[in-house]
Amino acid sequence: MSTAPIKHEGFLTKEGGGFKSWKKRWFILKGGDLSYYKTKGELVPLGVIHLNTSGHIKNSDRKKRVNGFEVQTPSRTYFLCSETEEERAKWIEILINERELLLNGGKQPKKSEKVGVADFELLNLVGKGSFGKVIQVRKKDTGEVYAMKVLSKKHIVEHNEVEHTLSERNILQKINHPFLVNLNYSFQTEDKLYFILDYVNGGELFYHLQKDKKFTEDRVRYYGAEIVLALEHLHLSGVIYRDLKPENLLLTNEGHICMTDFGLCKEGLLTPTDKTGTFCGTPEYLAPEVLQGNGYGKQVDWWSFGSLLYEMLTGLPPFYNQDVQEMYRKIMMEKLSFPHFISPDARSLLEQLLERDPEKRLADPNLIKRHPFFRSIDWEQLFQKNIPPPFIPNVKGSADTSQIDPVFTDEAPSLTMAGECALNPQQQKDFEGFTYVAESEHLR
């Protein structure tokens, strides 16, 4: 029995994992574990929630219970409710603090600091896009290497991308997951926005797939499993990703998946019936319901996931055609076919993910995890990064740029951009509240 001190205890009502009935249980928080018992005074817990592997801990009205909150773990999301709103707030605060303490190696989180451009040394240009660029930087006081995403406010305003950009910042601020890129800071100047993100240097999955033509099934299973956990976390946070493709998946220097670029995400979809209707994404990975234009939900990400798995296994997306209109026709109409080397388990999973009817599509992450294709995966060990990756990128440390396209790294890093200018005061108001500092050092 643990000798750690009890940090908090009390009754909460908990939803069952099997029959989904709600029962009052006695909860005790100690030693980084939240244990629950049939009643107060019991010695053997009915179950334990390990906070060191938990995802978000937040208020929740998804179960229509008063004073409800949820604790996400790799295996399931626990739904709990307290007697009063004050109790709920106290439980959430204590649980989050305990998790932060665990992830921070037992140290109290660092207090927020004011950060700006002058705090970073520019090292290398590592990416360029329509609204800005990505620069490898070093924070002068700590020596930590990051990716600085620099966006032009003028371009954002002119292309009506203010809402998307602020949404990306909001999503990055609230997510914390081993297979999603972390936001460490965000700040702004008169003419630019800055995201300070983890520097992930193992190369795009797209680059490795182009080099290898296709991956082994074991390698696809590993990457696919990490992507399942990342998508599950986004969906539980009310976010549809909408742009899953090899170019938006990076490998860390250790060989793990890191999902990046949340510019096309849609937030605020908390229930299974919530839908949106914007036509966006990358043609090869668009779900049929996006093409139909009648609104869509989180199921679109699982179609894209199926397309990505198919591409990793075979070398091309399932309905690929150089003629985009012909590709759309094939996505809507053509029968799914498989090369002879695709295993029965992989074929079964792909057929269920690439189901054209979103209501029939395999789109429940818990069912996906239990599919025979993933039978060898220990999901909690995977979440904790305790399963060795099948491939380690050839990089020397976390600051290496050898996997970055030389077309970028050969160009001197600079914060200047063509046609930039400061906005008027009214336009500047659109970017109020953009500044952010991650609450704890474990995000750095």
From Swiss-Prot:
InterPro entries in the record: AGC-kinase_C (IPR000961), Kinase-like_dom_sf (IPR011009), PH-like_dom_sf (IPR011993), PH_domain (IPR001849), Pkinase_C (IPR017892), Prot_kinase_dom (IPR000719), Protein_kinase_ATP_BS (IPR017441), Ser/Thr_kinase_AS (IPR008271)
Molecular functions per Gene Ontology: ATP binding; cAMP-dependent protein kinase activity; filamin binding; phosphatidylinositol-3,4,5-trisphosphate binding; protein kinase activator activity; protein kinase regulator activity; protein serine kinase activity; protein serine/threonine kinase activity
PH domain location: 5-100
Residue span, AGC-kinase C-terminal domain: 375-444
Positions of the catalytic residues: 243 (proton acceptor)
Biological process according to GO: bleb assembly; cellular response to diterpene; chemotaxis to cAMP; culmination involved in sorocarp development; establishment of cell polarity; establishment or maintenance of cell polarity; G protein-coupled chemorepellent receptor signaling pathway; intracellular signal transduction
Swiss-Prot/TrEMBL catalytic activity: L-seryl-[protein] + ATP = O-phospho-L-seryl-[protein] + ADP + H(+); L-threonyl-[protein] + ATP = O-phospho-L-threonyl-[protein] + ADP + H(+)
Span of domain Protein kinase: 120-374
EC number in record: 2.7.11.1
SUPFAM superfamilies, sorted: PH domain-like, Protein kinase-like (PK-like)
Example of a GO cellular component annotation carried by this entry: cytosol
Residues given in the record as ATP binding sites: 126-134, 149
Listed SMART domains: PH, S_TK_X, S_TKc
One Pfam family hit: PH
Keyword entries, A-Z: ATP-binding, Chemotaxis, Kinase, Nucleotide-binding, Phosphoprotein, Serine/threonine-protein kinase, Transferase
Function of the molecule: Predominantly involved during the aggregation to control cell polarity and chemotaxis. Phosphorylates talB, gefN, gefS, PI4P 5-kinase and gacQ.
Family under the similarity heading: Belongs to the protein kinase superfamily. AGC Ser/Thr protein kinase family. RAC subfamily.
Name of the protein in its database record: RAC family serine/threonine-protein kinase homolog
Gene: pkbA
